[in-house]
């Protein structure tokens, strides 16, 4: 079983990888306008991956916090609600489909 520190390190590593990939795609799209259209699918996949990571990180925080995470004053509870809000706020049909792919894999 991972410790809280190990879980946090794993999630952070995944975050840094997603961030690097997102910046690389943005740089590619800004350098070549034709590539901007070509990277739409990749950017949608990255957004879905980021939403999935956010949800898993919030869930890990709730799990690490224990029963107190359900209190309205809890930071973990607030993060969990925010993660769920971001999962549905402003999603396109393509992003919703990609997000469902992450949730069902």
Residue ranges of predicted features:
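Extended amphipathic alpha-helical segments enriched in small hydrophobics
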Residues: 1-34
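Extended aliphatic helical segments
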Residues: 4, 40-41, 62, 69, ...
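Short amphipathic alpha-helical coiled-coil/interface segments
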Residues: 8-15, 43-58, 80
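Generic serine detector
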Residues: 10-13, 30, 65, 73-74, ...
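Charged/polar positions within long, soluble alpha-helices
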Residues: 16, 20-23, 27, 55-63, ...
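Functionally constrained cores in energy, signaling, and assembly domains
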Residues: 22-25, 43, 54, 64-65, ...
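Catalytic-core signal marking the mid-to-C-terminal active-site face
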Residues: 27-49, 58-60, 64, 76
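Glycine-rich phosphate/cofactor-binding loops in nucleotide/flavin-utilizing enzymes
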Residues: 68-105
């Amino acid at each position: 079983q991972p410790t809280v520190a190990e879980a946090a390190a794993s999630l952070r590593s995944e975050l840094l990888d997603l961030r690097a990939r997102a910046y690389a795609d943005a740089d590619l799209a800004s350098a070549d306008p034709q590539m901007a259209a070509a990277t739409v699918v990749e950017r949608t996949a990255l957004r879905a991956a980021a939403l999935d990571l956010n949800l898993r990180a919030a869930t890990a925080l709730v799990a690490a916090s224990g029963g107190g995470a359900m209190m309205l004053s809890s930071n973990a509870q607030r993060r969990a609600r925010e993660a769920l809000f971001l999962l549905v706020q402003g999603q396109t049909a393509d992003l919703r489909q990609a997000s469902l792919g992450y949730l069902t894999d």
